[in-house]
């Protein structure tokens, strides 16, 4: 199958049968480097009410922490602004991946393709994964190409030193943001649940527990045998929290969306040098569904917005500690909760289990269905 991307020819063909993990699709194209000043960012004023923009450095007083807790429970998704990470950190890591895709063949990329991406990074080809399959649903292949990165404390698969430096820098800087967000969440929880001791979850804060995926959603149409509803189907992350940086499509198409508890679908515009925070199912599980995980996905563009709909994102997953036990000191009222960790229930767990589980168990259950057939 052949499609046009940025006036260039893109050939999408099945990989050879001996490729590891799955067959995916071959993506032969080039992606020009991004320049922050040239991207069509949305103003902060365009954010819907369901997605607050929070200056995490200004959340410290009792009143600020109480409002923070109200804000993050609206949809399980919020923007962090004034976070201290220079824009060039994200632009450089986007461009490192874009250069990798643009200057290599699919055969060369397969050197970095493996079924242990979650441990020490690596490349995942276009349609090489299924977030719905990982969440135990009917698989739909993800219309995205990815590179996983575990961080500087792990030896990652990497094509070159420049690629390594850009990815390590992004990991290092976003870990600082994630840690600040997590500690602020702990402080806010203690206001609502005075017996809660943040030290209970202290083992969560570890840079080795964080990895990210560098993603490109190319302007590629589905093949004739496919029926797709989304570029990435609606899902709930299994993470503790997820940080996301996104750049907008050239044509203004807003692909990323979140669904609120009342079923309202809210588009998430790309705000310059800002990080989205998604509450994940692990944090919902540990707080007995008090903090709602964010149901989100990426829409496919309608035919009139197909041209110019390519977009990129950096999705950072912060994992919980290895032992996951719902806090005995967080006991929300029934009206304060929502069913926010269905994957945990689907694999036989409950928030009322005093024994809890292990992250290894949860992760391996997810990975079983993640790689597309």
Swiss-Prot record:
One Pfam family, short name: DIOX_N
Binding site for Fe cation: 235, 237, 296
Pathway(s): Secondary metabolite biosynthesis
Catalytic reaction list: N-(7'-carboxy-7'-demethylgeranyl)-L-glutamate + 2-oxoglutarate + O2 = isodomoate A + succinate + CO2 + H2O; N-geranyl-L-glutamate + 2-oxoglutarate + O2 = dainate A + succinate + CO2 + H2O
Any one GO molecular function term: metal ion binding
Domain Fe2OG dioxygenase: 204-320
Binding note for cofactor: Binds 1 Fe(2+) ion per subunit.
Induction details: Up-regulated under phosphate limitation and by increasing partial pressure of CO(2).
Binding site for 2-oxoglutarate: 311
One GO biological process term: cellular response to carbon dioxide
Entry annotated with the keyword Transferase: no
Cofactors (names): Fe(2+)
SUPFAM superfamilies named in the record: Clavaminate synthase-like
Entry EC number(s): 1.14.11.-
Domain of life: Eukaryota
Descriptive protein name: Alpha-ketoglutarate dependent kainoid synthase
Organism annotation: Pseudo-nitzschia multiseries
Phylogenetic classification of the source organism: Eukaryota, Sar, Stramenopiles, Ochrophyta, Bacillariophyta
